[in-house]
Amino acid sequence: YPAVNAMLIDKTDKKTRQNAFSLLYLGTNIGIAVGPLMAGFLINDYLFLFFMIDAATTIISLIPILLWVKDTLPTEEEKESVPEDDSERAEIGNIFKVLLRRPVLIAFIFISIIYSMVYAQYSFGVPLFADHVFGLYGPRYYGIIMTVNAVLVVVFTIFIVSFTARIRPLINISIAGILLALGFGMLYFSEALYLFLISTFLWTMGEILFTVNTSVFVANNSPISHRARFNSVVFFVSQSGFALAPLITGQLIVSIGIVNIWPIIFLLAVAASLIMLGLYSFQKKVSLKQGIK
Protein backbone atom coordinates (compact mmCIF):
# COMPACT_ATOMS: atom_id res chain seq x y z
CA TYR A 1 0.00 0.00 0.00
CA PRO A 2 2.50 2.70 -1.13
CA ALA A 3 0.09 5.65 -0.91
CA VAL A 4 -1.26 4.68 2.52
CA ASN A 5 2.24 4.00 3.85
CA ALA A 6 3.56 7.31 2.51
CA MET A 7 0.69 9.20 4.13
CA LEU A 8 1.30 7.43 7.43
CA ILE A 9 5.02 8.21 7.26
CA ASP A 10 4.29 11.88 6.60
CA LYS A 11 2.02 12.04 9.66
CA THR A 12 4.43 10.33 12.06
CA ASP A 13 8.03 10.56 13.22
CA LYS A 14 10.61 7.88 14.04
CA LYS A 15 9.35 7.59 17.62
CA THR A 16 5.71 6.95 16.74
CA ARG A 17 5.92 5.02 13.46
CA GLN A 18 6.14 1.54 14.92
CA ASN A 19 2.92 2.05 16.88
CA ALA A 20 1.21 3.63 13.86
CA PHE A 21 2.15 0.81 11.50
CA SER A 22 1.15 -1.81 14.08
CA LEU A 23 -2.31 -0.24 14.35
CA LEU A 24 -2.64 -0.17 10.55
CA TYR A 25 -1.57 -3.82 10.39
CA LEU A 26 -3.97 -4.75 13.20
CA GLY A 27 -6.92 -2.97 11.57
CA THR A 28 -6.20 -4.62 8.23
CA ASN A 29 -6.12 -8.07 9.81
CA ILE A 30 -9.35 -7.50 11.74
CA GLY A 31 -10.97 -6.81 8.37
CA ILE A 32 -9.35 -9.92 6.89
CA ALA A 33 -10.68 -11.99 9.81
CA VAL A 34 -14.22 -10.57 9.78
CA GLY A 35 -14.65 -10.30 6.00
CA PRO A 36 -14.70 -14.03 5.15
CA LEU A 37 -17.00 -14.69 8.11
CA MET A 38 -19.56 -12.17 6.81
CA ALA A 39 -19.15 -13.49 3.27
CA GLY A 40 -19.90 -17.02 4.44
CA PHE A 41 -23.26 -15.90 5.84
CA LEU A 42 -24.27 -13.69 2.91
CA ILE A 43 -22.80 -14.94 -0.34
CA ASN A 44 -25.15 -17.88 -1.01
CA ASP A 45 -28.51 -16.23 -0.34
CA TYR A 46 -27.76 -12.50 -0.41
CA LEU A 47 -25.17 -12.04 -3.16
CA PHE A 48 -26.39 -8.56 -4.18
CA LEU A 49 -26.44 -7.40 -0.54
CA PHE A 50 -22.95 -8.82 -0.07
CA PHE A 51 -21.50 -6.64 -2.85
CA MET A 52 -23.49 -3.61 -1.72
CA ILE A 53 -22.07 -3.93 1.81
CA ASP A 54 -18.59 -4.38 0.35
CA ALA A 55 -18.93 -1.17 -1.69
CA ALA A 56 -20.48 0.73 1.24
CA THR A 57 -17.70 -0.19 3.68
CA THR A 58 -15.09 0.92 1.15
CA ILE A 59 -16.78 4.31 0.74
CA ILE A 60 -17.26 4.69 4.51
CA SER A 61 -13.56 4.02 5.08
CA LEU A 62 -12.66 6.85 2.70
CA ILE A 63 -14.95 9.47 4.26
CA PRO A 64 -12.82 10.16 7.40
CA ILE A 65 -9.72 10.54 5.21
CA LEU A 66 -11.47 12.97 2.86
CA LEU A 67 -12.92 15.02 5.73
CA TRP A 68 -10.16 15.10 8.32
CA VAL A 69 -6.83 14.17 6.73
CA LYS A 70 -5.18 17.04 4.92
CA ASP A 71 -2.78 16.54 2.03
CA THR A 72 0.40 15.11 3.53
CA LEU A 73 2.74 15.88 0.62
CA PRO A 74 5.77 17.57 2.25
CA THR A 75 6.28 21.23 1.38
CA GLU A 76 9.64 22.63 0.29
CA GLU A 77 10.06 24.13 3.76
CA GLU A 78 9.49 20.72 5.38
CA LYS A 79 11.99 19.10 3.02
CA GLU A 80 14.62 21.71 3.81
CA SER A 81 14.01 21.37 7.55
CA VAL A 82 15.31 17.77 7.59
CA PRO A 83 18.98 17.87 8.71
CA GLU A 84 21.69 16.72 6.30
CA ASP A 85 22.74 13.99 8.73
CA ASP A 86 19.24 12.47 8.82
CA SER A 87 18.42 9.35 6.78
CA GLU A 88 15.16 11.02 5.67
CA ARG A 89 16.86 14.04 4.10
CA ALA A 90 15.46 15.08 0.71
CA GLU A 91 17.24 13.82 -2.41
CA ILE A 92 17.38 15.06 -6.00
CA GLY A 93 17.01 12.62 -8.89
CA ASN A 94 14.80 9.79 -10.08
CA ILE A 95 13.90 6.84 -7.89
CA PHE A 96 16.67 4.56 -9.18
CA LYS A 97 19.47 7.11 -8.80
CA VAL A 98 18.34 7.92 -5.28
CA LEU A 99 17.98 4.25 -4.37
CA LEU A 100 21.52 3.51 -5.56
CA ARG A 101 22.79 6.03 -3.01
CA ARG A 102 21.29 3.85 -0.26
CA PRO A 103 23.01 0.45 -0.52
CA VAL A 104 21.66 -0.70 2.85
CA LEU A 105 18.10 -0.35 1.59
CA ILE A 106 18.96 -2.20 -1.63
CA ALA A 107 20.45 -5.07 0.39
CA PHE A 108 17.39 -5.07 2.63
CA ILE A 109 15.07 -5.40 -0.37
CA PHE A 110 16.86 -8.50 -1.68
CA ILE A 111 17.06 -10.15 1.74
CA SER A 112 13.33 -9.50 2.08
CA ILE A 113 12.74 -11.62 -1.03
CA ILE A 114 13.98 -14.64 0.94
CA TYR A 115 11.72 -13.72 3.86
CA SER A 116 8.69 -13.47 1.59
CA MET A 117 9.55 -16.82 -0.06
CA VAL A 118 9.62 -18.43 3.38
CA TYR A 119 6.47 -16.70 4.62
CA ALA A 120 4.61 -17.59 1.39
CA GLN A 121 4.61 -21.22 2.53
CA TYR A 122 1.58 -20.48 4.69
CA SER A 123 -0.51 -20.29 1.52
CA PHE A 124 1.28 -22.93 -0.57
CA GLY A 125 3.37 -25.46 1.35
CA VAL A 126 1.20 -25.62 4.48
CA PRO A 127 -2.13 -26.50 2.77
CA LEU A 128 -0.42 -29.10 0.58
CA PHE A 129 1.30 -30.58 3.62
CA ALA A 130 -1.97 -30.60 5.57
CA ASP A 131 -3.52 -32.63 2.74
CA HIS A 132 -0.52 -34.97 2.82
CA VAL A 133 -0.74 -35.54 6.59
CA PHE A 134 -4.49 -35.44 7.23
CA GLY A 135 -5.94 -36.61 3.93
CA LEU A 136 -9.61 -35.66 3.55
CA TYR A 137 -9.43 -33.61 6.75
CA GLY A 138 -6.64 -31.45 5.30
CA PRO A 139 -8.82 -28.59 4.00
CA ARG A 140 -10.81 -28.47 7.25
CA TYR A 141 -7.67 -28.37 9.40
CA TYR A 142 -6.06 -25.78 7.14
CA GLY A 143 -9.14 -23.60 7.68
CA ILE A 144 -8.61 -23.97 11.43
CA ILE A 145 -4.94 -23.03 11.03
CA MET A 146 -5.77 -19.84 9.13
CA THR A 147 -8.47 -18.90 11.64
CA VAL A 148 -5.94 -19.33 14.46
CA ASN A 149 -3.48 -17.18 12.49
CA ALA A 150 -6.04 -14.37 12.16
CA VAL A 151 -6.96 -14.53 15.86
CA LEU A 152 -3.31 -14.53 16.93
CA VAL A 153 -2.58 -11.45 14.81
CA VAL A 154 -5.52 -9.56 16.32
CA VAL A 155 -4.68 -10.59 19.91
CA PHE A 156 -0.88 -10.42 19.92
CA THR A 157 0.07 -7.53 17.62
CA ILE A 158 -0.16 -4.84 20.32
CA PHE A 159 1.74 -6.98 22.84
CA ILE A 160 4.51 -7.95 20.41
CA VAL A 161 5.00 -4.37 19.20
CA SER A 162 5.01 -2.99 22.76
CA PHE A 163 7.50 -5.63 23.91
CA THR A 164 9.90 -4.96 21.01
CA ALA A 165 9.42 -1.18 20.71
CA ARG A 166 12.91 -0.38 22.04
CA ILE A 167 14.62 -2.83 19.69
CA ARG A 168 15.96 -1.68 16.31
CA PRO A 169 13.80 -2.70 13.31
CA LEU A 170 16.53 -4.81 11.68
CA ILE A 171 17.07 -6.74 14.92
CA ASN A 172 13.33 -7.37 15.16
CA ILE A 173 13.29 -8.57 11.56
CA SER A 174 16.22 -10.88 12.31
CA ILE A 175 14.26 -12.32 15.26
CA ALA A 176 11.29 -12.71 12.92
CA GLY A 177 13.46 -14.86 10.65
CA ILE A 178 14.25 -17.23 13.52
CA LEU A 179 10.55 -17.48 14.43
CA LEU A 180 9.67 -18.23 10.80
CA ALA A 181 12.44 -20.84 10.69
CA LEU A 182 11.18 -22.58 13.83
CA GLY A 183 7.53 -22.32 12.83
CA PHE A 184 7.87 -23.78 9.35
CA GLY A 185 10.86 -26.00 10.14
CA MET A 186 9.04 -27.93 12.87
CA LEU A 187 6.47 -29.10 10.33
CA TYR A 188 9.05 -31.71 9.31
CA PHE A 189 8.23 -33.47 12.60
CA SER A 190 4.52 -32.63 12.71
CA GLU A 191 1.88 -35.33 12.29
CA ALA A 192 -0.81 -33.99 14.64
CA LEU A 193 -3.02 -30.91 14.52
CA TYR A 194 -1.69 -29.49 17.81
CA LEU A 195 1.84 -29.46 16.35
CA PHE A 196 0.54 -27.58 13.31
CA LEU A 197 -1.05 -25.06 15.69
CA ILE A 198 2.22 -24.60 17.63
CA SER A 199 3.90 -24.07 14.27
CA THR A 200 1.24 -21.50 13.36
CA PHE A 201 1.83 -19.62 16.61
CA LEU A 202 5.57 -19.36 15.92
CA TRP A 203 5.36 -18.24 12.29
CA THR A 204 2.53 -15.82 13.09
CA MET A 205 4.72 -14.10 15.69
CA GLY A 206 7.39 -13.88 13.00
CA GLU A 207 4.83 -12.49 10.56
CA ILE A 208 3.87 -9.71 12.99
CA LEU A 209 7.48 -8.72 13.69
CA PHE A 210 8.49 -8.83 10.03
CA THR A 211 5.50 -6.93 8.61
CA VAL A 212 5.46 -4.08 11.12
CA ASN A 213 9.23 -3.57 11.29
CA THR A 214 9.70 -3.76 7.52
CA SER A 215 7.35 -0.80 7.10
CA VAL A 216 9.16 1.09 9.88
CA PHE A 217 12.63 0.40 8.46
CA VAL A 218 11.68 1.47 4.94
CA ALA A 219 10.00 4.60 6.34
CA ASN A 220 13.04 5.56 8.40
CA ASN A 221 15.37 5.12 5.42
CA SER A 222 13.28 6.78 2.70
CA PRO A 223 14.02 10.38 1.71
CA ILE A 224 11.18 12.76 2.47
CA SER A 225 11.07 13.64 -1.24
CA HIS A 226 10.58 10.04 -2.47
CA ARG A 227 8.51 8.25 0.18
CA ALA A 228 5.68 6.88 -1.97
CA ARG A 229 8.04 5.88 -4.76
CA PHE A 230 10.39 4.09 -2.36
CA ASN A 231 7.47 2.22 -0.81
CA SER A 232 6.28 1.16 -4.27
CA VAL A 233 9.65 -0.20 -5.38
CA VAL A 234 10.41 -1.90 -2.06
CA PHE A 235 6.98 -3.55 -1.93
CA PHE A 236 7.12 -4.69 -5.57
CA VAL A 237 10.62 -6.21 -5.42
CA SER A 238 10.56 -7.69 -1.92
CA GLN A 239 7.14 -9.31 -2.44
CA SER A 240 8.36 -11.07 -5.58
CA GLY A 241 9.21 -13.91 -3.22
CA PHE A 242 5.48 -14.70 -3.13
CA ALA A 243 5.58 -15.19 -6.90
CA LEU A 244 8.74 -17.31 -6.81
CA ALA A 245 7.77 -19.50 -3.85
CA PRO A 246 5.13 -21.69 -5.57
CA LEU A 247 7.37 -22.25 -8.59
CA ILE A 248 10.49 -23.18 -6.59
CA THR A 249 8.64 -25.07 -3.85
CA GLY A 250 6.64 -27.01 -6.43
CA GLN A 251 9.83 -28.18 -8.15
CA LEU A 252 11.31 -29.19 -4.79
CA ILE A 253 8.19 -31.16 -3.86
CA VAL A 254 8.41 -33.09 -7.13
CA SER A 255 12.13 -33.74 -6.62
CA ILE A 256 12.44 -34.54 -2.89
CA GLY A 257 8.90 -34.84 -1.55
CA ILE A 258 6.78 -32.44 0.46
CA VAL A 259 8.11 -33.58 3.86
CA ASN A 260 11.69 -32.73 2.93
CA ILE A 261 11.02 -29.13 1.90
CA TRP A 262 10.75 -28.00 5.53
CA PRO A 263 14.45 -28.39 6.45
CA ILE A 264 15.26 -26.29 3.36
CA ILE A 265 12.74 -23.63 4.40
CA PHE A 266 14.26 -23.69 7.89
CA LEU A 267 17.79 -23.13 6.55
CA LEU A 268 16.62 -20.36 4.20
CA ALA A 269 14.96 -18.48 7.07
CA VAL A 270 17.97 -18.88 9.38
CA ALA A 271 20.31 -17.68 6.61
CA ALA A 272 18.10 -14.65 5.92
CA SER A 273 17.99 -13.87 9.65
CA LEU A 274 21.79 -13.99 9.97
CA ILE A 275 22.29 -11.86 6.85
CA MET A 276 19.80 -9.32 8.22
CA LEU A 277 21.78 -9.23 11.47
CA GLY A 278 24.94 -8.62 9.44
CA LEU A 279 23.18 -5.82 7.57
CA TYR A 280 22.33 -4.20 10.91
CA SER A 281 26.01 -4.27 11.93
CA PHE A 282 27.02 -2.83 8.56
CA GLN A 283 24.42 -0.05 8.74
CA LYS A 284 25.52 0.82 12.27
CA LYS A 285 29.15 1.18 11.16
CA VAL A 286 28.22 3.25 8.10
CA SER A 287 25.94 5.51 10.16
CA LEU A 288 28.64 6.13 12.75
CA LYS A 289 31.18 6.85 10.02
CA GLN A 290 28.91 9.27 8.13
CA GLY A 291 27.23 10.75 11.20
CA ILE A 292 23.75 9.75 9.99
CA LYS A 293 20.93 9.59 12.54
Predicted regions and their residues:
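Helix-loop junctions on the cytosolic side of multi-pass membrane transporters
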Residues: I65-E80, G278-G291
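Juxtamembrane intracellular "pre-TM" segments in multi-pass secondary transporters
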Residues: T72-F108, K293
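Short amphipathic helix-loop junctions that connect adjacent transmembrane helices
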Residues: F124-Y142
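Cytoplasmic helix-loop-helix junction between adjacent transmembrane helices
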Residues: Y1-T28
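A late C-terminal transmembrane helix in Major Facilitator Superfamily
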Residues: S225-I256
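Helix-to-loop junctions at the C-terminal end of transmembrane segments
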Residues: F156-R168, I253
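Structural signature of the two symmetry-related core transmembrane helices
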Residues: I171-G185
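Symmetry-related core transmembrane helices of the 12-TM Major Facilitator Superfamily/SLC fold
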Residues: F50-L67, W262-G278
